[in-house]
Amino acid sequence: DSSTSRGLGDVYKRQVILCALQVQYSLALNLQKDWLIDGSSYQAKVTTTDKELCLSNGLLSRTFILSPNVATIAFDNLMNGNAELRAIRPEAVLTINGMEYPVGGLYKQPVQNFLNNDFIEDMISCDTAFTYVSHTVGETIERFPYRPKQEWLSNKNPWPAPGKRIVFTYKAAPRAPEMIRNVTVKVIYELYDGAPILSKQIEVENQGKSSIVLNSFKSEILALTETAPKVHYGEPHEIRMLAQEPGTYTRNYRKSPAQTDAPREYIDRFTQLFVVTDYAMGGDMEAMKDNPAVRWVFDHPEYEATGIRYYGQYKPARLEVCPPIGPDYEITPGMTFRSCTAFEMLRDATDNERRGLAECRFWRMMAPWTQENPIFMHVRRSDEASVKAAIDQCAAVGFEMVIMTFGSGFNIENNSPEYMEMMKRLNAYAHSKGIALGGYSLLASRGAKTEDAAISRKTGKPATTREEGSRFGKSPCLASSWGDTYFGKLRSFLSLIHISEPTRRRGIS
């Protein structure tokens, strides 16, 4: 009857109000202020005890044990109280001259799906691992010089993003082979003020008398907690990137580590961690394939015995940051190799709107040049009269840049004196009108000689199709002598002309 309906309605309203109050109380309990609105109170700091070091900013914390070797023993989301780490892994892994060596880390964890202090007390250092020597604490430093174009910025952010920086130094173990005894490894962390963002990079320095080859590396390894069930583990779509056969990774996923290169919607189902490196490409249009150094793998065999099983299957619960190929880099005496930088952001929500706002903040802080958005016009011909006409049009209507587009005839590789003089005149004319001048240089989809082409891992010959590992047909390899010449010409042109250059670097095999 109506009275019963009203009674149920009142009960429902009270339940909704109670739930809302509980959510508000929970948020107030965890955070005094919403970091997306005002993150000024969340300052990065480093605290140390006799055996531990903690890097925290009130939103994210990462805790390290210092003895018997450095290892990450906690990775906590302070926004919701979640512990993200379930098992200890090495701080990094290097393959040098064909031999694999862990950096830091502890071993003999009896159970892999959770971690407690009793486990840690009984764990030991690997006798082949690079061993902790010292650490330094300081402020964040810029990864490279960056001069913002203030007139193009929609949001102004400091560079570098302020925060704290820790550098852990490791030496080879006493029983290590002679070839690596004079190798020093540095693991570098930066935690930033005002956001749950952490970055990590490794450096390998050869202080010996002989060259070594860094065949491959893993600069980050995190065994993470699983946050949501997923019945079907998905088929990786890594065929395009590595030219692998379908099913390569999932065919025997119980027997070997399997990588997923699935869409981000799938990855987001089981982790609150957003990860990207400066190897990323493609404008994030295909999120995982454009982020090739970030790998989500099934944590076998360690996790097999003690992990939680959903319908007899597992989700990829281990993060690894490593390039899919190589680098096979020769480090000569006195030289230092620097890896890509991994950026990790913990999320505090599952809804797309808040996650999207967090990613916007991430890019503004970590890559503030993404906020430089000039209003530009493409000019279809690069002869002097056409470019000047386009410059005049842009100046008249308030545009800020002219770009000599594909097929316009602009050739940044033309270093003839006549061409250089014409470009200098056009650049000076553009600047006199308050207009920046740029041009496209086609990199990948231009064809290549056989000796300069990117080689398919599948065929051993120049890649020509997506299945063979090429996005744009036969493409030049940047590691070839052609690549050295190409970039040398670009740098020479830009230094002589002082042109503003949005060089288009399309997907590389």
Model-derived features: positions:
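Single conserved hydrophobic/aromatic residue that forms the stacking wall/gate
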Residues: 1-15, 497-501, 505-509
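Active-site groove signature of glycoside hydrolases
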Residues: 400-407, 485-496, 500, 506
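The substrate-binding groove and active-site-proximal loops of carbohydrate-active enzymes
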Residues: 373-384, 405-420, 468-487
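An acidic-aromatic substrate-binding cleft motif
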Residues: 352-408
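Short Pro-Gly-centered flexible turn/kink motifs
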Residues: 329-347
